[in-house]
Each structure stands twice: as C-alpha cells, then as structure tokens.
Amino acid sequence: MLDKVKKPGWRQVKFGDVVRQVKERVEPETSGLERYVAGDHMDTDDLRIRRWGEIGSGYLGPAFHMRFRPGQVLYGSRRTYLRKVAVADFDGICANTTFVIEPKNAEELLPEFLPFLMQTDAFNEFSVKNSKGSVNPYINFSDLARFEFALPPLGEQRRSVSLLSALEDQIEAIRAASNATTKLRKSVALDAFSLVDSPKVKMGAVADIRNGTTPRRARDEYWKGSIPWLPTGKVNDRIIDAADEFITEQALEECPLTLIPAGSTLIAMIGEGQTRGRAAMLAIDACINQNFGAVIPGKTLDPWYLFYLLESNYEALRHWSQGTNQHALSCGLLKEFPIPIPDLNRQREIVESIKEIEANERQLAERFKKTAEMRRVAHQVALSVG
C-alpha cells in the first residue's frame, strides 16, 4: 500500500474507487477486428505491445472474447510477478485472463497516469501477495480493487506523466539502438564466415564433443555442493558465467559427468520452440546435463571463433537433426557437423571484428539498466512523498 504522508491535495483511495475493469465481450469471427493479444505477446516492464496474433490465422481459444480499445490498459492476471502491463494502441481482442482496465473518471485519474501506477513496486507486490494458486497463480479484479494508494492531484499527475514518459522514450531509444547493434553483429558474423574459403572439416576431428547427465535428485549427497551444474535452459544466457545449481564431488565421481572447461561452446541438443541449436559460450568450468552438447576446441580452434561460428549456424544446427527419429541433435551428429577452419590469425581477426560490436552492445545494456532503475525510482516518487 502506498500510504506515505501526502502533500496537500493528495488523497488515499482504493484502486477500485478510481479504476474499472472493462468487460466488452465480442465474437472474434464477427467482430470485424483483425488482431488479438495473448499473454506471451506482452513483455515484462514494457508498456508497448510489440507483437500480436492475426484473428482467423489459426485456432483461437474460447477465452478470447474481451475487446480492448486504444488507450486502455491490459494487465496479465496470471503469474503477476511477471509484471505485464501494456497500453493498447490499436483495437483488438484478448483473453478474459487479461484484464482490460481504464479510469472511471479521466478528470480524477489521468488515463496516461494509470499504467505508470500499475508499474510501481507497491502495486506489483500487492498483486503477487493477493494472488491465488501455486502452479499458475492468478488474481481476481475484486482483490486488485482493494489496493490502496495516495492519488495525486491532476497537476501532479501531469508532471509525473511528463517525467515518466521522457524516461520511457529514453529506454525505447536505447532498446532500438541495442536491437540495431545486435543485428549488425549478427550480420558482420554471417558475412565474415561466408567469406571463409577454407575447406570444411568434421567438427569431431578438431574438437572434443561430449555431454553430461542429471544426477539423481533423490540423492541429497549429490546436490548443493560447489561444482557448477548447468541445465539446457542456461543456453539463453549466451555467455554463461554463473550457475544456479551446484553438485558435489561425490556426484562428479559417481555419475557420468565431466567438468567442462571454460572456453567451450555449449549447444542445446533438445528443446522446445527455439531452444534446439542455440549456442552459448561457457565462461566457467562446469558440468552439464544430458541435453547439452559441449564442444571443447582443440589447438587449431580459437574458442571465440568456434562460439561465433556455431552461433551463426543456428538454423543449420537445428536442421542437422532432420531425418533422425527423435528430431534432436546428439554428440554423434555434432561430431559430423562440417565447419570451416582458417588459420588462427584469420580466426582472431574475425573474433576481434565481432567483439568490437559486442563492446557497444554491453555499453548499451548498461545504459538500459541504469535508465530502467531511474524509471523504477521515478515510479515510486510519483506515488509517494518523503
């Protein structure tokens, strides 16, 4: 609850006193609308809707019957710890698990102020605390309506909107620059590898390729040790420099595990969606599970050249398993994967050209982090005093 000492003109209200849930039901096929927004179309801490589905392009579940209009706020009521709040800038349909919200009176609560209120830590903490269920927690609007906060007068709301909107614009500019820099890096890498005219060799001839296993969870003596252990999902880190789970020396000795050295490239051999074929650079010594393939470079391979090469061959690696029964990669298949190997000097030239762009990516990521923290603090200041 945002209940700091209030300035003159501020008043304590409940969310449900000034906000309403819009329940405008439509039939998707006859609504004349073209787009729908599902939960996975909304991103954490991002007020913009950047993706959507096309109505009529495939099966749309029976829950998708709530209409939203430009300016209304969409709020993901499932797993609210994901902080999914977005402002619609087009007409569309969402599921009934996505709340469509608007102010009851725009002369009391500015529509532009509402989404910033819903991004505050206090609002999110209240929503998470009052959610029901454990596997897929959800909150009812009637519970959300009990959230209390100090409502600023309209002039204060306008000033807060001006500040927060400026920060949103900064974040959007940094995000756009970051996306452009990432695209440039990928393009430079593809161009560099396409110009390599060295003969291709089977990867197993120039690298040691192996996988690991998952020690039995029931054996307590195998877990909570000091040796990093990585599941396949860690591939999304791209540069893996920390582990979330650790195993013991006993697990390393008794299970079919090897400590994979830093500088190896890990490839996700099995995975739903876009996971299979992804590559990550291992920046620490670690053990891996059975669905990771570790490519440990030999003397003729620069570790970063190998990583960038395999990262650029994402689609080729995904399709390398075609024709197999399980539609998955394996250590055997990875050993057969052909890669070009120029001399080490040329490899390092390619690496340096990519690393130069990566340095810019890191700078932008740091700017994004700092600006996002400024935005978070500004959210709190906008709704509290003292």
Regions found by a protein language model. Give the residues of each.
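Non-catalytic DNA-recognition/assembly elements of restriction-modification systems
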Residues: M1-V26, R146, A150-R158, D169, ...
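Periplasmic-binding protein-like
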Residues: F123-F126, A316-L317
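A short glycine-rich beta-alpha junction/loop motif
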Residues: L2-D3, P8, R78, G92-F99, ...
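Active-site/binding-pocket entry motifs
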Residues: M42-D43, Y81, V235-N236, E272-G273, ...
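A short beta-sheet element
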Residues: F64-M66, P70-D121, P231-T232, T248-E311
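Sequence-specific dsDNA recognition surfaces
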Residues: G16-P28, V37-P70, G204-R219, G233-A262, ...
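Extracellular/lumenal glycan-associated surfaces
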Residues: V161-L167, E352-I357
